[in-house]
């Protein structure tokens, strides 16, 4: 079997831990039953010995496979990782969702996306990345009694993303330590109103309002201080026809959205201006993970 799991960008400014969308940048994993266990890694993490000795995908896969099938089989895993690690593009969510879905498939169980999403919550306790990795598109999610409730909206085909990826890795745990311990009443209202309005913009295709709807007072500024160049990235994007420009997840990547022609032009300009960063033009994925 082969499974493709997309990269994701979460929060989208004010939608902390609840909003996210799916990008056409995929981790690809092939799994086959084998006489002996083996693992090979290409792309991101290929030079990391730890990922071969203690691979999270493999650990989750075996945990669920053995629970579902009651068997202890050996498998051959071939990873082609295209999602940058610890850059705020959902690399950990792609691993979690991919491992769970693969285990269900290889156990002979029906792969139901709602079930996969609920199980993924065991390993990642906020749904902003795991939901779009599972469902695709733009997704608004919440958790109630250990169940994920999500509403998905397909993203307009005329839109594309420009993602700026710094060399600095930034784990979610590390990034959360930069957050303020308390939030003022006014700032809480600001984020609630902006997250709600941002969601409505995607649902109703009111993209002209995204620039101010995507503003945040909860997490972005404190996280961006770890890499001050990101303030310049955001300013440059918004001055060059980006409809919105926000920190991607917990960082360090930065996500900008624009109409396709504008996004292509923006990507070229950013490649010239921010030579030390990787800049990628990406279209949006509306399917979530797919098993081939």
UniProtKB/Swiss-Prot annotation:
BP terms from Gene Ontology: threonine biosynthetic process
UniProt-annotated location(s): Cytoplasm
Keywords assigned by UniProt, alphabetized: Amino-acid biosynthesis, ATP-binding, Cytoplasm, Kinase, Nucleotide-binding, Threonine biosynthesis, Transferase
Primary residence: cytoplasm
GO molecular function terms attached to this record: ATP binding; homoserine kinase activity
Keyword presence, Amino-acid biosynthesis: yes
Catalytic activity reported: L-homoserine + ATP = O-phospho-L-homoserine + ADP + H(+)
EC number(s) stated in the UniProt entry for this protein: 2.7.1.39
Residues the record lists as binding ATP: 84-94
Enzyme class, broadest EC rank: transferase
Pfam families for the chain: GHMP_kinases_C, GHMP_kinases_N
One Gene Ontology CC term in the entry: cytoplasm
Pathway: Amino-acid biosynthesis; L-threonine biosynthesis; L-threonine from L-aspartate: step 4/5
Source species, domain of life: Bacteria
Cytoplasm listed as a keyword: yes
Function of the molecule: Catalyzes the ATP-dependent phosphorylation of L-homoserine to L-homoserine phosphate.
PANTHER family recorded: HOMOSERINE KINASE, HOMOSERINE/4-DIPHOSPHOCYTIDYL-2-C-METHYL-D-ERYTHRITOL KINASE
Family listed: Belongs to the GHMP kinase family. Homoserine kinase subfamily.
Full protein name: Homoserine kinase
């Amino acid at each position: 079997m082969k499974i493709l799991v997309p990269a994701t960008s979460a929060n989208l400014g004010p939608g902390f831990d609840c909003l996210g969308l799916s990008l056409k940048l995929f981790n690809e994993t092939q799994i086959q039953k084998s006489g002996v266990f083996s693992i090979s890694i290409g792309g991101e993490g290929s030079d990391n010995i730890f990922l071969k000795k203690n691979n999270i995908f493999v650990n989750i896969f075996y945990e669920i496979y053995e629970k579902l099938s009651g068997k202890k089989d050996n498998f051959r895993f071939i990873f082609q990782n295209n999602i940058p690690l610890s850059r705020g593009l959902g690399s950990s969510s792609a691993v979690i969702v991919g491992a769970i879905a693969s285990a269900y498939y290889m156990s002979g169980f029906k792969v139901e996306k709602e079930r996969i999403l609920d199980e993924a919550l065991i390993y990642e306790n906020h749904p902003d990345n795991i939901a779009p990795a599972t469902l695709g598109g733009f997704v608004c999610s919440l958790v109630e009694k250990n169940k994920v409730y999500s509403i998905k909206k397909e993203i307009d085909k005329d839109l594309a993303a420009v993602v700026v990826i710094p060399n600095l890795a930034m784990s979610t745990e590390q990034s959360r330590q930069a957050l303020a311990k308390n939030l003022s009443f006014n700032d809480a209202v600001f984020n609630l109103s902006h997250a709600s309005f941002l969601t409505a913009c995607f649902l109703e295709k009111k993209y002209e309002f995204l620039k101010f709807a995507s503003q945040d007072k909860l997490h972005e500024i404190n996280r961006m201080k770890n890499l001050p160049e990101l303030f310049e990235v955001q300013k440059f994007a918004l001055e060059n026809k980006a409809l919105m420009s926000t920190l991607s997840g917990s960082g360090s990547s930065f996500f900008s959205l624009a109409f396709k022609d504008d996004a292509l032009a923006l990507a070229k300009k950013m490649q010239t201006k921010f030579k030390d960063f990787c800049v990628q033009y990406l279209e949006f994925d509306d399917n979530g993970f797919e098993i081939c």
